[in-house]
Every structure is written in C-alpha cells, then in structure tokens.
Amino acid sequence: MKRLEVLFFLVVVSLFSCKNSSDEHNNIIHKIKKSPHDFMFMQRAYPSGELKTDAYSKAVQWKKERIYRSTNANVLWEFAGPTNIGGRITDIEIPVDKAETYYVGAASGGIFKTTDGGDNWLPIFDEQEMLSIGDIEISKNNTDIIWLGTGEVNAGGGSLAYDGNGMFKSDDGGLTWESRGLPDVGSISKVLIDPVNEQTIFVGAMGPLFKKNNQRGVYRSTNDGQDWEQVLLVSDSTGIIDMSIHPNNGNIIYAASWERIRRPNNRQYGGETSRIYRSQDGGDTWEELTNGLPSDPNDKGRISIDISQSNPEVLYAFYTDKIGNVEGTFKTTDGGDSWAEVNSISNGTSYHWWFGGVFVDPTDENIVYNSGFVMEKTLDGGTTWGSTFSNVHVDQHAVAFNTQVPGEVLIGNDGGLYKSSTNGDTYQKDNTLPITQFYRFYVDPQNENKVYGGTQDNNTIRTTSAGIDDWQPIFGGDGFQPLVQSDNTNIIYALSQRGNLGKSINDGVSFNGALNGIPSSDVNNWDTAITFDPADSQTLYYGTQRIYKTTNGAGNWGVISPDLSNGPHSGNLAYGTVTSIDVSPLDSNLIYAGTDDGNVWVTQDSGTNWTLVSDTLPNLWVTKVLASSSDVSQVYVTYSGYRYGEEHGHVFKSEDYGTTWSDISNNLPDIPVNDILKDNYGNLFLGTDIGVLASADEGENWEPLGVNMPSVVVNDLHIHENSEYLYVATYGRSSYKLDISNNILSTSFTTLASAITLYPNPASDYVNLSFIEAGEDYKIEIYDALGKKVLEKNNVSSSSDGRIYLNGISAGIYYINVYSDTDQTTKKLVVN
C-alpha cells in the first residue's frame, strides 16, 4: 500500500501559537442561533451527494428480521432521559371528541399520544421504518381514524437526513398502522380529509429535499388511500408546503406551493413558482390566485395558508421572501378571489423558511397565530399583532386549538410542547416527552449521576442526579461534544456549532472562551472533534482541517499537523475537516485522525510525522477512529454514507497501526455507522442509523442489541468505566443506557424463546403464557416502550397456562421478560 509520510516541521507551530486576537473565540454567547445546517445530510451523502433510501429501508428490515431471534433478544434498554428538554415538534392534533387526548409528531422521534392531558405519553409509531413525522390528520366523524404523512418538511439539512416513506392509516387510535402508499414523495406537509366523503384524502407533498423530481405536488385518493392520483404538479423543484380545505365543502381546496432547492453547496428557498392555488372541483382543476398577492419572484418564498372554520370565506396567508425574511401577511374575505395585505408579525429573522406558519382559531376568524421565530397573535384580524407564549423556546412549528376546552392552545417548537389554558397568556412546558436530538454524550468519570449531552438547538445539557426529567442547559447553541476532566470534575469543556469551545472551572456555572491559538480562519466541522489524552487531563486535541494540541488545559493551543483533509473543496462545500481524533490509552504518542473526505492518518510521535493509512479504505466520511485499549497496534475505523456499486463495508480493523485493514462489516447491512466502542469483554458496539448493533466475535457476526429501542439514529456511544454502563445518544428519542458489567452478549441462541407463546396478542385484560414443556417456574417482568418496569410476577408455573392480568396497564407496546433458572427471553406484547 502506498504510504504518504509527512514531516511537519515544528517551526510551523510557532506561527499559530500566538494569541488569537479575535474576540469571537473568547466570548461565549449562551444562545447562539444560526440557520439550520446540512450536517447530517452531508456526512451520509459524501461523496455522491445522494442518499440511498432503499438501502436504509433494507437495513431496517434486516433489523426487524433479527431482533427477536437475535442472541441479544433478551436485552432491554433503560431510558436515561431527558423528558424535560424536548425537541422539535412538527405537528399537534386534538380529536374533536376527546378533550385530554393529544397526538404529537416529532421531527425524528415518531408519534406520541396522551389520554390524560399530557401527564403520560405513549409512543405509537415505533414499529415503523421511519420516525420522521410530517402531518397528522384525525377524522372528525370517527376519531379512532388517523392519517399520517411521514417526512419532516422543515428544510433544515442539519437535522434532516432522511425523507419519509409515505402515508399511513390507523383505525384504532394509533395502536396499529397500515401503509397507504406514496412511499417516494419525500416529505408530506399536509393531509386533508374530505369533510363530506371521508374516503377522499388529499396530500400535499414537498418531494425529496435534496434532488429534483416530479414526485411532489397534490395527491388525491378517492378510495381510502388504496390508490393515489397526482392532481397538481407545479415543477420538479416545487412542492406543496401547506393546504387547507373548506370545512363544509370538500370540493374547495387551497394549496401553497414552494419553490425550494437545497444542495450541500447551494440553497434557493423561493421563486416564481411559489404560489397559492385553489380548486373548486375536488382537485380536478386548479387556478393560481394572484389578486393582491406578491408577484415578484424575489418576494415569494415559503407560504403558509389557513382557512377559518367559523367563516370559510376568510383565509390568511403568510409569505416569506426568497431569502427567508418576512414578506407579509395577507387576508381574503371572499374565498380567495381577492387578497389584501394586513399588518404582519414583527419578529425578523432571515430564515423564516424554517417555520413560517399561520393558524386561525376555529371559533373566531379574527384570532390568528403566526409561528415564526417567536409566536405572535392577532385578535383583530391582522390589524395589530402581539407576542404570545412569551419566552418559550424559539422556532415555532405547530399550533393546535382544543375546541372542547375554551382557551386551551398547544404549540410546538424546536424545544418541545407548550400548553396554555389562557390563549397563550400563561403556559406550561410539557416535561414528559422523550424526543431530544443528541449529537454527543459524556458522563462524569467520577460520578455516574452527572450526565452531559450536546443537543440540536437545545444547548449542552446535563443532569446531576441521573434523572430523566431534571436536565438543565449549561452552554448555549447547538450542543456538541462535552468533556469532563477526570482529576478535577469541576472543569468542563463544551462545544457549540462550528467549534465554539468554552471551558468552565466552576462545575458549569460559567464558561469562558478556550480557543486561544486557533485561528478563526481555520475550517471547522459543524460537529468539531475534540478529545482528551487519556493519560494526561491537561492535554487535549482539537480538529479543524488540522489538529491542535494543548498541554495546559486549553490555556493555549498549538498546531501539530498539516491540513489532513483533501481540501479546500470547490464551491461552498464544507468538506475538508477532521471529524475524529483518538489518542491511544496505551501510548500517548500514538494518535489517529479521520476526516470528512475519507482520510485516516496516524502519528506515532505526537504529531511530528503523520502517515496517511487510508489508501485501501472507502472514500466516505470517517465517523470514528478507535485506538484499542488492549493492543497498542490495533485500531478500528467506522464510516457514514452508503455503497454505490462498491462492496466495501462500514467497519474496518487493523492490527498494524493502519498499515493493512480488514473489513469486519460481514453481515452488517449497508447503513451509516456513527460510532464504535469496545467493552472489557471484547464486545463491539456500533451506533448506527437504525440503532445499536453488537458483535461478540470481532465483527464476524452483527446483531441488533436490545428490543425496546426504535429504529432511530444513534450518533454517539459512551462507556462509563466506573459504573460499567453503556450510554446511547439518539437523534430524536433522547438517551438510553445498559448495564454491561456482566458479559451481556451471548454466542448462542436462547432456547426459551421458542418454548413460550403469548396469547392473546394483542391483549386487553390479560395475557396467557403457554409453555411447551412443564416442570419449571418462571419469573415474569413487563416493561413499557421506554424500559420502565410496570409489572413483576414470580413463580409463574409452566404446568398450566400462566395468566397475567394487565390491570392498570395502558394501551401500547410492551416487552415481557421471562426468566428461568438458566435462561431468559423477551417477548413483545401489544395491549389494546
């Protein structure tokens, strides 16, 4: 293999060891808000610029086929929080006949249902392939009928990696779901049920975010979703971002189109084909509405439209311009024939394409909410606007009115769910939804109760009690890798987007900038790499396109490498940065680095010489380089992305410092791998886009680990050495943990699994356990979908059917652990 030796003269270090004069690196702003970035898409799409959604689907099916017959099928994850931080909400719906039942759609966390006004929530979409939620619609005639359009429409590639997979319908209040087509329309913005004929359904589709095609527009089904017809296509780069239907006449439909082009290197969020359309014949024909509406292509970006339920002649439309600024709010009182601009909201950010919604109170045509950067409301039809739900988390996306409870309004934003009983004048945040989107994770090395995480748009957060509902922010912006110094845990490092590093010496009470010596002209990854030297807590490494080292706890940094990437890349592509750094715990001179454009490097002399060791490895985004803790010459590397006509895997191992590599992916599906760790028993764990996978035999065989975690992106893994717990940071379902103090992986399949049958399943009042062979007593434990034990029963006899009564157990998905003296298995139970 060709080897590239780089001698990096130490004199270069002196060029960058001087104090950086830029204040931006030394001033920490605790709420840094920038427009959403393409990070998650970029790492999965490199170098082709596309995602293989068919490969993702196959990977999910691979997992489903194995999860209950896996050698690890008896493993249950314990939910580790948080519930009180929240995450991005895309939709909220309230049935017209159930005042305390709400359905909430999360951007990447599925659907949650409550029947007690938000005290308790149940995930009801976890068995499905995609947890990205677009729009929920509930029948007014039978509120057990729910339609769902998958795929988040908010155009933030930093948080959006996968589109949806079409339409789903539930006839039992969300307990079970059936696919109803349109798997290729990308993200679905709106689902409408014809108020007269509920067999007729309309769907607004934005199409795939990162490519042009004609699978977007308005779709119609006249036979309950069995067949679909595209009834409006504006262009191959213009989708439907919002729709409304006349409450009494299903022939009258309004659709707002949005010309939207997003690529890793460019963005266009508006243009001539951003329009409002109306159909008066049930979607057969459409007319563009123009009278009084913006006409200049530069003035037409994302458009939201809503119809008054109390006076259907009144509609409101909210326009952003092509850049994302507020263009105006427009109102019609004649069903759309003519429009007039009313006063508009005041919040002025330049990325209203991230939200920009308008919602009319169903009981009063003059009360309108606008979901912008903050939430604003008018009580007089748009003449004046004022703030409502003041001081909630920014970036508003959803509003729901409870028509059975006057004054009750729910809103959803990037920080979760808020509920008001006073029309927004006062409110409470919901602290029970487990939908936080983690990027990175860390646990205090001396105190397992102090757990840290970096989150999407919800800061760097922590709990000091290992609780699930008491997490608090300590460092602003999008949070990334936190670190805690092992010999003085009052010293904490925290990162926000693009490498903004802060250091606290008072246990997180305050932070100061910690980038002295790193030029602001360097290129930072959205998720900047940073790590400790395991042997010296004062020594840290930090990656831009180069690697920097500090030996005095970030007092100052010096560069120890050349540009390790293949950059600078052409255009606006942000590739060309270090994504992973790892220092051998056996030799501090041995350092590995990986980049977002496929390079893997090693130095064995603390950075004086660097060797490129990736010539035979895939040209994909490197997510993790892991130096072995048991063999100094052993190293692992993992990759994001997909195969395109190539047979390479996503996990590789070297026994000679990277000189040669073995692909240990083997039966692993074609799926991005985001992290790898190894425990004291030699077990390997992978964080992937479909959850956690594990191998007990150095990658010869990979199996799903645990049965109660949905197919959610796992960005980070962390093993806490003292407590011997494995922590998992998910992107949309908060975090989980697992006791690995004993060897949890087995190389043989359980025999108990095939010896037990559950019936009835689904169950209501009780479930029977039927045993093939009698003669032994068993212990039974039932856990909910979040890993909370809800029932335990000992000495269940196998001599006859063991009946377990389900008193007090709500409808939902549960897992029954069955223990014998020598074996254990887990069975899935549906309670309805």
Residue locations for each model-derived region?
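Beta-propeller blade termini and top-face loops
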Residues: S21-N742
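C-terminal outer-membrane/trafficking sorting elements
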Residues: V6-F9, T750-Y759, A763-N832
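Low-complexity, Pro/Thr/Ser/Gly/Ala-rich linker/spacer regions in secreted
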Residues: D739-A755
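C-terminal motif of bacterial Sec signal peptides marking the signal peptidase cleavage site
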Residues: F16-S17
